[in-house]
Amino acid sequence: MIKCSFSEEMAVRKPKPIITLIGVRQAKKGLKFIHEPSSEKCKDCQLYRVCIENLERGRVYEIVGLRNKKFPCLLHDEGVRVVEVVESDIASTVPQKSALEGATITFHAQNCENQFCKFKSLCEPVGLFDGDKCQIVKVENKIECPLGYDLVKVLLRRIIDA
């Protein structure tokens, strides 16, 4: 069950950039990546907090800014570069009755049992977890669900309480 609330004054919230580090070769504006656990080599690095700890495991981030500062790194042969990232908006599905642009919802994956469904990655998207509070940034189109569920493709932005 998705809980939904909406207010006319509620604008789509813009995510606040986070400063972190990424390999010099990967440091390209617009690049999206999934934050995964670090290597054992990272544990004693003095940059561990800014590089690893300020991002959440399993979330999808997008590089929105590049800074000129670079540092040596045991994992990246060309070192790491300071970048600005935001959590990426995630394409997903919601029941049609909840698909209202600007609405705030509590995300729950659809848990589709059809392993071969072409919409499975939308119904169970990477980067969102059950219980996440999200805002519907964009309502896209109705999904022709093979199991007959009344679903709509949307773009979700997780709401991070400051």
PLM ranges: what are they?
Residues 102-160:
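Long, low-complexity intrinsically disordered regions
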Residues 4, 39-55, 111-125:
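Cysteine-cluster motifs in flexible loop/terminal segments that predominantly coordinate metals
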Residues 42-45, 68-77, 141-150:
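Short, Lys/Arg- and Gly-enriched loop/turn segments at beta-strand edges
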Residues 27-41, 104-114:
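Short, basic/aromatic beta-hairpin or loop at an interaction surface
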Residues 50-52, 73-90, 147-161:
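Short, compositionally biased
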Residues 2-24, 70-98:
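Extended boundary segments
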